[in-house]
Each structure stands twice: as C-alpha cells, then as structure tokens.
C-alpha cells in the first residue's frame, strides 16, 4: 500500500542527532558537510555535541531537524511508495523536499532564513505557548480573543495550543483553568504561529519569492488550509501564511487519511504518532527517526 509521509517540526530535536547516520552513510556525511558550507557555521558540531539548551534554540533547531529529516527520507525513499506528504510546521519544508518542490540547498537556505527571522521575533517580542487539554475550541477561541492571544496548533479535538505574549498567555491560562481546562506550558522560546511572528513572515516572503521551485510529485496537505495542494503558487502561499497562522494538524490528518491509512513519520524523534492516533486510531503509523529504524 502507498504511504502518507509526514515530517515532524520544531521540538523533535535531540542531542547527538545524526551522528550515527554521519558515521554510517556517505549520503549523510556529504549532506551534513554541505550544510556546514551553506549555513556558514558548523551545524554538525551543534547537532552532534551541543547541550539541549543550545540545540533547542530556534536558529539551530530548525536547520538541524530539516537536515536530519531529509537524510532519513533519502535513505528510505526507494523502499516505500508515497501517495501524499505533510509536515508539522517546520516539517512542511522537509515534506516539500521529499516532494521535489526544491532541492536540498534551496530548502536549507529558506529554512535558515525562517529560523533566523523567527529567532529575531523571539528576542523582539517575547512570548510563550501552552497546550490546552479537554476544552472545546470555541471556548478556547473566546478566551484567546478576550486577552489578545491566538490559537496556534489544532493538534486534535482534545489538544489545542495557544500562543501569544507572556502576559496574554498567563491571563488565558488562568481563565482556562477556572473553567476546568488542563493547561500545560510548552518548552519553547517564542510565540510561534501567532501575530508576534509577523516580522518573520515578511522575511520569508522575500526568499520564497526569489527562489526556484519545481512541480510536486504528490499532493502536499498544507498546515495553513489542510487541503491537498499541487500548484506551485498555492504551496508558496501556504508556506508564507503558516508562520503566523494556526497549524491545522487535525484537519490535515483527516485529509490525508482519505488517501491512505498507512503513515510514515520521519524526523529526529517520535512525536506525531501519538497525536495522530488521537485523531484516528485506525491509522497505521511507522516511525523512522534514527539508524535503528532503517
């Protein structure tokens, strides 16, 4: 059966990521050494040796996850048939590499611009994110509107992530707890997929509009609208819009499940499988995150 390939996003990093791949496969060694040249700094040192508090920083985590995910994809692509792709936030860029939308160098350059721009927003507009469990999206939206924060991820019907300034998230969290919600602060460094990322969006527009893209091989279900996209222009627009709009993950999985019930999760860590099972427990999910899975 053909598979839906899905790629994890920021938060799926892990110290030592890609080191075993680098030491085992020539394609991994070549890819990582090329990445050092493209980025202009030693990303391999950060991936292989950096502590968690360094690797998790947006400007390093995003390129590192993209590099790792694309290596894994290239190692398994001839073994599995694909019917469609998707990625969670940053993972959408790995999905587009797998879909022939851009070559590796183009993809990494775009991811680097995105990561640096988002990191700059983190510094200029401090914010945070929290997961909300067990409350309807309508109630969450109403509270967010009242304190000026946003819904950032709709991961499943029972897990919604909110994003905004530190003050607005504190106020929203208090109100949500008062109505019985479980609120879990996330270990992230900024207010992703919210209007505090609007400056980063402008920088992403510039590089996307000056980059070369190819026709895709399969539909990509985009975070922004959860619809299968195949046209270059619609894919570009969705990439730009997702940076300060909610990740429609639950709807994306439901859209993909119409194409196949077999999913492959690709990324440094198993993070999407449990979320997907909460959306539709009939789906079969295989994870590729390290050399042990190959």
Walk through the language-model features, giving the residues of each.
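NAD(P)-dependent dehydrogenase/reductase Rossmann-like domain
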Residues: 207, 212, 246, 258, ...
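Short, hydrophobic/aliphatic alpha-helical segments
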Residues: 1, 76-78, 177-180, 252
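FabD-like malonyl-/acyl-CoA
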Residues: 1-139, 263-291
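Alpha/beta catalytic cores of group-transfer enzymes, especially the acyltransferase/condensing modules
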Residues: 10-12, 39-41, 100-244
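Glycine-rich phosphate/pyrophosphate-binding beta-alpha loops
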Residues: 61-63, 191, 246
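A short, acidic, amphipathic alpha-helical segment used as a generic capping/interface helix at domain edges
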Residues: 244-260
């Amino acid at each position: 059966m053909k598979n839906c390939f899905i790629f994890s996003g920021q938060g799926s990093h892990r110290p030592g990521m890609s080191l075993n791949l680098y030491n085992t496969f020539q394609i991994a060694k070549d890819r990582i050494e090329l990445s050092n040249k493209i980025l202009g700094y030693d990303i391999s040192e950060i991936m292989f040796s950096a502590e968690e508090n360094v690797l998790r920083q947006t400007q390093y985590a995003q390129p590192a996850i993209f590099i790792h995910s694309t290596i894994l994809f290239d190692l398994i692509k001839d073994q599995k048939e694909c019917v469609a792709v998707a990625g969670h936030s940053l993972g959408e860029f790995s999905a587009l590499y797998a879909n022939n939308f851009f070559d590796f160098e183009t993809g990494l350059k775009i991811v680097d611009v995105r990561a640096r721009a988002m990191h700059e927003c983190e510094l200029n507009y401090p914010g945070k994110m929290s997961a909300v469990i067990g409350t309807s999206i309508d109630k969450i939206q109403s509270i967010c509107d009242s304190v000026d924060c946003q819904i950032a991820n709709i991961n499943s019907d029972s897990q919604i992530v909110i994003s905004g300034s530190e003050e607005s998230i504190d106020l929203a969290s208090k109100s949500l707890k008062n109505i019985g919600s479980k609120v879990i602060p996330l270990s992230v460094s900024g207010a992703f997929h919210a209007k505090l990322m609007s400056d980063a969006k402008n920088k992403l527009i510039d590089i996307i509009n000056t980059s070369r893209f190819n026709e895709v091989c399969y539909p990509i279900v985009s975070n922004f609208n959860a619809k299968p996209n195949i046209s270059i222009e619609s894919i570009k627009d969705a990439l730009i819009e997702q940076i300060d709009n909610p990740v429609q993950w639950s709807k994306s999985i439901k859209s993909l499940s119409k194409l196949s019930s077999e999913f492959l999760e690709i990324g440094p860590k198993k993070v999407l499988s449990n979320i997907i099972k909460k959306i539709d427990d009939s789906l079969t999910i295989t994870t590729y995150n390290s050399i042990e899975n190959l």
